[in-house]
Amino acid sequence: RSGKTVAMTVGFIMWAMTRFDGCNFAICGKTIESLRRNVTSNLPVWLAGVFSFKEHRTENKIVVSANGKSNSFYLFGGKDESSAALIQGITLAGILLDEVALMPESFVNQATARCSVEGAKLWFNCNPEGPSHWFYTKWVLEASRRKMLHLHFTMDDNLSLSASVKARYESLYSGVFYDRFIRGLWVVAEGLIYTMFNKDFHVVPSVPRPYEKYVMSCDYGTINPTSIGLWGKAGGKWYRMREYYY
């Protein structure tokens, strides 16, 4: 409820229409249905009197026009690994990924690789997940190196929310959900089995070691995925050498 979707979408459309003419852009969500429901169906309201919008539903395309300029905005859903194939081939001048943390990394990598027009920019928004999430480690923490502008939205940035509404939302959450959805922090989820996991400490290079003993571990995972590991003991430490994950 920080208003990030409105701010980012309006900003993206206005930037695209100011800088380009006759170009293709992409707006991506978890699914095209959720994208239409939460984002694109509201564009004529958010930008009333500024741009004209014409939707071509069979092509999943919206043509935006104003002052003699016209650009096409294609809609894509990034719900699973197979979605990456759907966005291949198109050349883009910019892309907006709404709720990017819900999308697989393969889709995002393919989508960002489509932006080859001179002056193209990448726009992302999301609610935080865990601190080991790929988008946090590879994009948020690398914002400076990637020359990205990182904006942290909270409910206080949404001037349309009254004090009573904000207070009600704050009372709905506690613990990790409060930290993520109210404070906007990338924190570890409660209930994780290995909350102490630290990638810098627990992940080591795969090199030959004088293993003296081997064991197999298996977590069947009645609800969660099955995980089978081959462990080797060397120098008083156990190393997970191989794994099967299904």
Predicted regions and their residues:
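Inter-Walker segment of RecA-like/P-loop motor cores
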Residues: 34-93, 186
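ATPase catalytic-site recognition across NTP-hydrolyzing enzymes
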Residues: 158-218
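Conserved P-loop
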Residues: 1-61, 136-137
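Catalytic P-loop NTPase motifs of RecA-like helicase/translocase cores
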Residues: 3, 35, 102-104, 131-132, ...
